[in-house]
Amino acid sequence: MQAQTLEVTMRPEVGKQAARRLRRQGKLPGIIYGKKIANLAVIIPARQLEHILATEGENALLKLVVSGDGQNKEFTAVIREVQRHPLKGNLTHVDFYQVSMEDKLRATVPVILEGEARGVKEGGILQHGVREIEIESLPADLPESIVVDVSHLGVGEHLTVGEIKVPAGVKILSEPDTVIATVVTTRAVETETEEETTTGESPAQPAE
């Protein structure tokens, strides 16, 4: 994975009021931290970061160029946490974690199902199990997502984490027996729906 350059500046003011002013200017408050550096408050260009998230995903490897106090610093980092407005969905705060290219790190990556399952062609329904798995790799080997081919799955068959093939240098940490995808019959889905409906119904109250 190639590092994406993001230019940020030192943030002299912290607190809610200062953060609101930044957002009105199209900027975001953020922080850089890691094992070998002190916490560093920064100002992030919102539009540029949104573009990186849209094209590279939240597991993007970043080269942060920090300016301020008459000097420039560079950090290799990953996005550790993204905060968004609960209603509007826009970014409100971002945490960056400094990494070493020689040290492995853990990350949660999305699982994307690819292909039309054989069982679906036979009248079954494909059900998605877990949508994310935990992995470990060097920063340069960190994938944006794990793509899994499900075209071979027939009715009644499933695919587990232990059967996934990952790129070289990537180790899966999630439990191997965790189900990624299953092809079930239409009747099985109908039965499950009926059971959920029955469970959700309240018993009739006797008339007074």
From Swiss-Prot:
InterPro entries linked to this entry: Rbsml_bL25/Gln-tRNA_synth_N, Ribosomal_bL25/Gln-tRNA_synth, Ribosomal_bL25_b-dom, Ribosomal_bL25_C, Ribosomal_bL25_long, Ribosomal_L25_dom, Ribosomal_uL5_bac-type
One GO cellular component, as annotated: cytosolic large ribosomal subunit
Keywords: Ribonucleoprotein, Ribosomal protein, RNA-binding, rRNA-binding
Superkingdom in the source lineage: Bacteria
Keyword Transmembrane: no
Quaternary structure, from the entry: Part of the 50S ribosomal subunit; part of the 5S rRNA/L5/L18/L25 subcomplex. Contacts the 5S rRNA. Binds to the 5S rRNA independently of L5 and L18.
Alphabetical list of HAMAP family matching this protein: Ribosomal_bL25_CTC
NCBIfam families for the chain: bL25_bact_ctc, PRK05618.2-4, PRK05618.4-2, PRK05943.1
Family of the protein in this entry: Belongs to the bacterial ribosomal protein bL25 family. CTC subfamily.
Protein name (record): Large ribosomal subunit protein bL25
Naturally occurring in which organism (per UniProt): Moorella thermoacetica (strain ATCC 39073 / JCM 9320)
Taxon lineage: Bacteria, Bacillati, Bacillota, Clostridia, Moorellales
Encoding gene per record: rplY
